């Protein structure tokens, strides 16, 4: 019997922004894997809301609402994994933002593929599966 591998994808904030800007490569890949196989973190939603408040544009608040409806959300719950990631990076003299470490912790603990345009940033985290949908294939 052949077992099929079925990835579930966690979309980083930059991918959601690219989707809202109608990035052809992100839209194409989303169609290939299906929106039902893509999730976001509450952290991503928080970052999108920050951008909406920063811009002050009603359209951006509407965009966040659409993203929120489109994708299932993972709550912030992998606090211990965040601490481990932060400690491991600090021991190596490396640093990424706290929000990104929470997103990475979710991807690791839930066995998700993290989709980001910032692969170099996240590849510092051992064991994290990362894809860049912003690159054209």
Q: Which sequence ranges carry the predicted segments?
A:
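Short, glycine/acidic-enriched loop or turn micro-motifs at the edges of active sites
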Residues: 15, 21
């Amino acid at each position: 019997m052949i077992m099929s591998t079925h990835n579930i994808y966690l979309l980083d904030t930059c991918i959601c922004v690219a989707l809202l800007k109608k990035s052809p490569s992100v839209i194409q890949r989303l169609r290939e894997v299906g929106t039902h196989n893509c999730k976001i973190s509450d952290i991503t939603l928080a970052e999108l809301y920050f951008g909406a408040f920063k811009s002050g544009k009603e359209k951006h608040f509407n965009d966040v609402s659409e993203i929120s409806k489109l994708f299932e959300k993972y709550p912030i719950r992998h606090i211990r994994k965040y601490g481990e990631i932060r400690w491991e990076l600090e021991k190596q003299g490396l640093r990424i933002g706290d929000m990104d470490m929470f997103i990475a912790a979710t991807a690791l603990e839930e066995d998700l593929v993290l989709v980001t345009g910032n692969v170099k940033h996240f590849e510092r985290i051992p064991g994290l599966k990362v894809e860049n949908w912003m690159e054209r294939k």
